[in-house]
C-alpha cells in the first residue's frame, strides 16, 4: 500500500509522486505557454470521460483499482489531470463540487463529478469528469479577451483561434499510440515522464 511504498522510497532517498504524465504532453505544455504569454485571467471548460468498462476491456472494472471507492475512476481522472491544470493556471483558491451517479455500473462512488475551480491567477475553470461517456472524451477550451484555445485530447486536435481563423497547432513531429486505447492516450508522454 501507500505506507509501504513511502517507506521504500524514503529508504532509498527517492521522491515518490503520483503520475504526472499530462505535464509531459506537448499540448498541455503549449497551452501553459500560451496562457503565460497572454498574461491575463482566462476561463476554461474541460470535460474528461470514458465508459469505465472500456478502460481495460480485457478485465472486469470491478476487479482493478477503478472499481474501488478509494481509488475509483473519477479520482483517477482528477489525479491525472489536476497536476497540469494547477501548473498552468495556479493553485486553487476556491472550489465548488457537484456529484452524481447516472449509470447502472453499480459503483461505490459517484460516476460524474463537476468542479468549479477558482485559481490564484484569476483563472476560473469548469472541470467535469465521468466514467459513463460512451465515447472516450477529452475536450478542453480556454478563452480570454484575445486568447482562444481548443484541444480534443489528441495530438491531431489542438487549435487556436487567431485573426479570425481556427488554426491547427502541431506539437508533435511524430507520436506513439497503442491501438488498444483511446486516441487521447499518447505513449510519448509516458516515455518522457
What are these regions (language model features)?
Residues 28-30, 53-60, 107-110, 138-140, ...:
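Short aromatic-enriched loop/helix-cap "lid" or pocket-rim segments at secondary-structure transitions
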Residues 1, 17-24:
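Rossmann-like NAD(P)(H) cofactor-binding subdomain of soluble oxidoreductases
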Residues 16-19, 126-128:
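Short catalytic-loop micro-motif centered on adjacent basic/acidic residues
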Residues 145-193:
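C-terminal glycine/acidic-rich active-site capping loop/insertion
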Residues 77-157:
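Contiguous beta-strand/loop segments that form the cofactor/metal-binding neighborhood of enzyme cores
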Residues 22-98, 103-106:
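Predominantly a Rossmann-like dinucleotide-binding segment in NAD(P)-dependent oxidoreductases
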Residues 2-15:
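Rossmann-fold NAD(P)-binding glycine/threonine-rich loop
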Amino acid at each position: 500500500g501507500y505506507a509501504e511504498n513511502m517507506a521504500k522510497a524514503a529508504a532509498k532517498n527517492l521522491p515518490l509522486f503520483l503520475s504526472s504524465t499530462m505535464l509531459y504532453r506537448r499540448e498541455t505544455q503549449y497551452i501553459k505557454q500560451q496562457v503565460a504569454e497572454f498574461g491575463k485571467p482566462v476561463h476554461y471548460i474541460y470535460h474528461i470521460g470514458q465508459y469505465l468498462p472500456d478502460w481495460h476491456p480485457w478485465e472486469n472494472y470491478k476487479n482493478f483499482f477503478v472499481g474501488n471507492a478509494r481509488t475509483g475512476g473519477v479520482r483517477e481522472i482528477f489525479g491525472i489531470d489536476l497536476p497540469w491544470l494547477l501548473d498552468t493556471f495556479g493553485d486553487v483558491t476556491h472550489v465548488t463540487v457537484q456529484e452524481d451517479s447516472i449509470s447502472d455500473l453499480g459503483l461505490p462512488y459517484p460516476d460524474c463529478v463537476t468542479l468549479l475551480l477558482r485559481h490564484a491567477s484569476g483563472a476560473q475553470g469548469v472541470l467535469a469528469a465521468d466514467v459513463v461517456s460512451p465515447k472516450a472524451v477529452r475536450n478542453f477550451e480556454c478563452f480570454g479577451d484575445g486568447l482562444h484555445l481548443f484541444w480534443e485530447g489528441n495530438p491531431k486536435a489542438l487549435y487556436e483561434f487567431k485573426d479570425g481563423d481556427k488554426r491547427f497547432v502541431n506539437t508533435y513531429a511524430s507520436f506513439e499510440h497503442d491501438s488498444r486505447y483511446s486516441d487521447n492516450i499518447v505513449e510519448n508522454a509516458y516515455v518522457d515522464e
